[in-house]
């Protein structure tokens, strides 16, 4: 039926209901959705009348009749509703088999846009945000019913987010989880886990009466000493000489402002106090969080939004934002964490901190060195924020370090040079992943080169870059020699540098790990030998697990139970332990990956996390989540929050969904790889 005929047919059928339409308030008020719903109701009434006289209405009326029922079925099966607005539009393009033509109807007039059908690209937030329950998990929520599906769907599946999250069979194994209490801890360290407790930030328009107060000089000296010894070496931001000069003036003349931006400097000082308080691991939990949060709230009030957005930028403003961002990183303020990092990066760029030579700018060599130091910290901060929050980091031009030998560089210059080179490799890794996840890249990809093959080609070159970086490290910087470094600050710097290097390796190999676990175990026929692509995929997954093992080993080396302050900040230790633990959970699905060595590394991660339970309530929740997920895979009794055991879980061979396991720790492998907008990985 043509569009014009359809319109006349509708008018003739509804003409008899003109009086009811005129009296309908929704129709008179111009509500399109309600009016469309009313029209469908009229069509259903006509449908019932026509059925009595054995007359048949056009096919689309029958679809309207079954709209809500079909939506319920599609929702239960986890598929996009075939009767949704977007799906109907697609059906008008593809002709069904066995029909010469299909009826093309004006969809907006027939299907009320009451609710959009679930998108295949992004799962509904309500589903992604809540852990699965026994009754809410379907038996099979990924059944390909499209007879014209792409033949290479399985091949590119792990590299294309449009196909949604990984699907798997849940079958009878889900019924055996009837007594399971779903994990309520979906938070991730340095993402949204409140490691520093609940931080309530006051409105910046409401100044705190104590915002300009300073602690007693003796206690302040103690906190300043802790910061320079145990916080600044990890990520240097401030110039020590300038900071100490202003610090002395603040206590010698506390009433007279030191400079025009006195409030800004007080904000820096209060964040320094807050980080130093959190660094003391032996202090009682509630006392530490309460005191540190009070210092941070003072700094927050002292830095109003107008000073960040509309006033000219300064190095002090960038430094204050970076310090604030470090603290916010360990709270549940994701939006403020992401925003402060972006502001610091943009303001630093506006000041040309990213340029090695700025002949038009006046300033001493010390100012230029400080700008380069701040810019290097900005890049490191942006990388940490973006990879942990699952956002795309800024692909900025990083100045090339001077081509000097290790003997010609000092210790600090060597650390900065290695850091800049590593950040540049990280830029290339992320760029390769972004290029592979865009539709534009797929359009210009050679016909015989799949998304998987293209990323594998890039990964080979990037792996060589990482290997060259590791080979360029002097012998006394190698991991095997780190324990022999006598200077505590230097040893901490080198440990953190190697942890970041291993993080880059995990970030590079994780797409292949995701692809490896998306493949069904029986996809390879028994009578055929594994292909080269399959072997490379398996080897890449093994290298990802090996990097996670090295992360766990390095973190355990830094543990010093007898020291009041650990070698590395305790929030970084929890962060990297969480990364390693998630990869070990993935290894449990494959016997060729979860070897005895990996099992020992898994146990070391659990022991290390138990040693951090006194530092944050989140650690106990993380432990319980890891133990529960491991029990689901291995079939051992899973624990409860009170320490008791629960029923038995089944092993991975019985059809437990891989994504169903990892959604409880907010870990979406598919979104992490190549999401349409963000990476979407909670762990990185």
Curated annotation (Swiss-Prot):
The keyword Coiled coil does not apply. Disruption phenotype: Has low impact on expression of the sorbicillin biosynthesis gene cluster but, except for very low levels of dihydrosorbicillinol, impairs the production of sorbicillinoids. One of its GO terms (biological process) is DNA-templated transcription. Residues 114-151 are annotated as: Disordered. It is found in: Nucleus. GO terms for molecular function: DNA-binding transcription factor activity, RNA polymerase II-specific; RNA polymerase II cis-regulatory region sequence-specific DNA binding; zinc ion binding. InterPro entries: Fungal_SecMet_Regulators (IPR051127), Transcription_factor_dom_fun (IPR007219). Keywords: DNA-binding, Nucleus, Transcription, Transcription regulation. GO terms for cellular component: nucleus. Transcription factor that acts in concert with sorR1 which is a transcriptional activator of the gene cluster that mediates the biosynthesis of sorbicillinoids, a diverse group of yellow secondary metabolites that restrict growth of competing pathogenic fungi but not of bacteria. This is Sorbicillinoid biosynthetic cluster transcription factor 2.
């Amino acid at each position: 039926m043509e569009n014009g005929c359809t319109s006349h047919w509708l008018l003739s059928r509804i003409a008899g209901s003109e009086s009811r339409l005129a009296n309908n308030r929704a129709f008179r008020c111009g509500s399109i959705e309600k009016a469309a719903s009313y029209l469908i109701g009229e069509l259903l009434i006509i449908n019932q009348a026509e059925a009595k006289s054995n007359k048949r209405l056009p096919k689309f009326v029958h679809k309207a009749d079954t709209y809500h029922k079909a939506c319920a079925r599609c929702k239960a099966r986890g598929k996009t509703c075939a009767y949704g607005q977007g799906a109907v539009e697609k059906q008008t393009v593809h002709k069904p088999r066995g029909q010469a033509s299909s009826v093309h109807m004006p969809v907006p007039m027939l299907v009320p846009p009451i609710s959009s059908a679930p998108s295949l690209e992004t799962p509904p937030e309500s589903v992604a945000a809540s852990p699965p329950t026994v009754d809410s998990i379907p038996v099979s929520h990924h059944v390909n019913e499209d007879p014209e599906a792409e033949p290479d769907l399985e091949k590119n599946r792990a590299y294309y987010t449009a196909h949604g999250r990984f699907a798997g069979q849940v079958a009878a194994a889900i019924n055996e989880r009837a007594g399971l209490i779903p994990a309520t801890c979906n938070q991730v360290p340095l993402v949204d886990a409140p490691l520093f407790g609940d931080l309530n930030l006051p409105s910046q328009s409401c100044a705190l009466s104590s915002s300009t107060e300073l602690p007693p000089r003796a206690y302040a000296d103690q906190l300043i000493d802790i910061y320079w010894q145990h916080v600044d070496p990890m990520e240097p931001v401030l110039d020590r000489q300038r900071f100490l000069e202003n610090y002395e003036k603040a206590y010698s003349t506390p009433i007279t402002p030191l400079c025009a931006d006195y409030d800004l400097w007080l904000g820096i000082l209060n964040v320094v106090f807050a980080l130093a308080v959190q660094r003391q691991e032996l202090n009682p939990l509630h006392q530490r969080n309460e005191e540190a949060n009070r210092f941070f709230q003072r700094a927050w009030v002292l830095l109003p939004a107008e000073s960040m957005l509309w006033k000219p930028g300064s190095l002090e403003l960038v430094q204050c934002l970076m310090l604030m961002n470090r603290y916010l990183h360990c709270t549940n303020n994701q939006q403020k964490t992401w925003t402060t990092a972006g502001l610091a990066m943009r303001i630093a760029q506006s000041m040309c901190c990213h340029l090695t030579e700025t002949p038009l700018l006046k300033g001493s060599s010390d100012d230029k060195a400080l700008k380069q130091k701040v810019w290097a910290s900005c890049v490191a901060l942006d990388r940490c924020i973006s990879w942990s929050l699952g956002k795309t980091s800024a692909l900025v031009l990083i100045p090339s370090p001077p081509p000097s030998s290790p003997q010609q560089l000092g210790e600090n210059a060597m650390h900065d040079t290695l850091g800049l080179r590593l950040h540049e490799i990280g830029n290339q890794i992320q760029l390769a992943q972004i290029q592979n996840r865009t539709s534009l890249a797929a359009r210009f990809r050679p016909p015989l080169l799949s998304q998987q093959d293209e990323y594998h080609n890039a990964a080979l070159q990037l792996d060589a870059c990482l290997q060259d970086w590791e080979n360029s490290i002097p012998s006394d910087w190698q991991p095997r020699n780190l324990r022999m470094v006598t200077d505590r600050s230097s040893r901490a710097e080198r440990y953190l540098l190697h942890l970041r290097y291993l993080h880059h390796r995990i970030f590079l190999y994780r797409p292949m790990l995701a692809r490896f676990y998306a493949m069904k175990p029986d996809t390879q026929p028994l009578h055929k030998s594994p292909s080269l692509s399959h072997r490379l995929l398996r080897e890449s997954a093994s290298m990802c697990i090996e990097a996670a093992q090295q992360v766990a080993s390095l973190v355990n080396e830094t543990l010093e139970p007898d020291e009041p302050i650990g070698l590395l900040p305790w929030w970084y230790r929890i962060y990297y332990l969480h990364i390693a633990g998630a990869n070990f959970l993935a290894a449990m699905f494959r016997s060729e990956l979860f070897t005895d060595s990996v099992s020992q590394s898994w146990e070391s991660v659990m022991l290390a996390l138990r040693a951090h339970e006194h530092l944050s309530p989140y650690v106990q929740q993380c432990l319980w989540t890891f133990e529960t997920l491991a029990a689901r895979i291995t079939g051992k009794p899973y624990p409860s929050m009170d320490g008791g055991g629960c029923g038995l879980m089944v092993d991975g061979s019985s059809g437990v969904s891989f994504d169903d396991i990892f959604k409880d720790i907010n870990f979406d492998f598919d979104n992490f790889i190549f999401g349409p907008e963000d990476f979407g990985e909670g762990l990185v």
